[in-house]
Amino acid sequence: MAADIRIVPCLTDNFGYLIHDPSSGATASIDAPEAAPLIAALEKEGWKLTDILVTHHHGDHVGGVAELKKKYQCRVVAPHDANAKIADIDLRVEEGDVVRVGGLSARVLETPGHTLDHISYVFDDDRALFAADTLFSIGCGRVFEGTYPMMWESLLKLRELPDDFKLYCGHEYTASNVKFALTIEPDNAALQARAKQVEQQRAAGQPTIPVTLGEEKQANLFLRADVPSVAAAVGLPGESAADVFGELRERKNNS
């Protein structure tokens, strides 16, 4: 039976996510930006939280962990080298590990760059990628702890997933990401189409997530740093994809 996924807006622009296995009743929260909205969503659905799958240590992703752990006695899964900012870790995971949530299986990918401990969770059977702050729709996370080549390699790892996977990212940044991307690739038809879709979604008060990886591969600049036209657009024809990515990220930082 397919997983049920709920998007739970948290804080100012964070996404919390609940993924539920109808067969076993198990439910995981992907990160826990704050407890109250997640508790409300769980109670609305009649679900009991069994697991929290943490992607990285930033406070806007783990701020609700301690309260949820206390209330539900749930298991906290976190990156193997996560620091002390994450409370009460029960299981540390690394590349290639598989985390089971009832009958659901999540494969762990190490995706460092935004932070050194960042991981993503891949639910292959449910065609769902929870990439937190590594990959956004039409964007990517700032590189706080890693390097640009490191972040580029992480994005390449996610780009290898099939086109039909749906991306669930950490923040609602899509509108601003689209605005920036159009300054680099104004003639990208896939980006233009996504821009119209995002405008309609935001006007209706709807989230811009999920989106398929196939769409992102066509429209997201940060997944296309190895495309010659993108390199040329930032004045780096013939340079390495990592250097082009770094230039894109610097420009986005200053936009």
Curated annotation (Swiss-Prot):
Enzyme nomenclature, EC number: 3.1.2.6
Functional note: Thiolesterase that catalyzes the hydrolysis of S-D-lactoyl-glutathione to form glutathione and D-lactic acid.
GO biological process, one term: methylglyoxal catabolic process to D-lactate via S-lactoyl-glutathione
Catalysed conversion reaction: an S-(2-hydroxyacyl)glutathione + H2O = a 2-hydroxy carboxylate + glutathione + H(+)
Binding site for Zn(2+) 2: D60, H61, D133, H171
Lineage: Bacteria, Pseudomonadati, Pseudomonadota, Alphaproteobacteria, Hyphomicrobiales
Annotated metabolic or biological route of this protein: Secondary metabolite metabolism; methylglyoxal degradation; (R)-lactate from methylglyoxal: step 2/2
Keyword entries, A-Z: Hydrolase, Metal-binding, Zinc
Signal peptide extent: none
Stored Gene3D superfamilies: Ribonuclease Z/Hydroxyacylglutathione hydrolase-like (3.60.15.10)
Residues annotated to bind Zn(2+) 1: H56, H58, H114, D133
Cofactor: Zn(2+)
Record text on cofactor binding: Binds 2 Zn(2+) ions per subunit.
Name of the protein this chain belongs to: Hydroxyacylglutathione hydrolase
Similarity annotation: Belongs to the metallo-beta-lactamase superfamily. Glyoxalase II family.
CDD domains per the UniProt record, alphabetical: hydroxyacylglutathione_hydrolase_MBL-fold
Root EC class: hydrolase
